Amino acid sequence: MKKIILIAALICGTFFAKAQVDVITKHNGETVKGKVVRVDEYTVIFKYDGEDSENVLGKYAIEKIVYGKSGRVEDVTEKIVVSTEDDWEKVIILEDKTAATGLKKSEEIRGKTGLINYHTGNSGDKKAEKKLKMEAAKIGCPFILLTADKSTVGSTSNGLGGSQNIKKGIAYKY
């Protein structure tokens, strides 16, 4: 009788030990099982179950985290759905490379204003940003990692005194 109770206690202890694994659910449907070490501003640092090395995932790639010990569910980010060019306003520009960790790199894109235009420095910048976001939306990518932001004004631009804004980035998706 004592052996049966001991075996039952060991089996229950094993199940409880396994149940304390944190589960990270990504927006693309993948789940990652391990131990969340910490949640930073743009990233989540975790260790895979049975490993000691720390891994990093950007928060934009993560839907939620279910903590194994407490059972608490933490919603990290909502999924951004960009299906047509009309969804360009939903596109997010990332300025920190670590925020793109865990997302799939798509292609390099560019948005710019014309050489001769009637934009001020600020409105030209907004126009270039809009074109950049529209390019990302056209290929179905909700994120852009900004790689270059160049503005030329006056005689350095085109010799005609106009201004031109050029923004380049890498488009990312889930």
Residue ranges of predicted features:
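Bacterial Sec-dependent N-terminal signal peptides
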Residues: 1-21
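Compositionally biased alpha-helical segments
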Residues: 19-152, 161-174
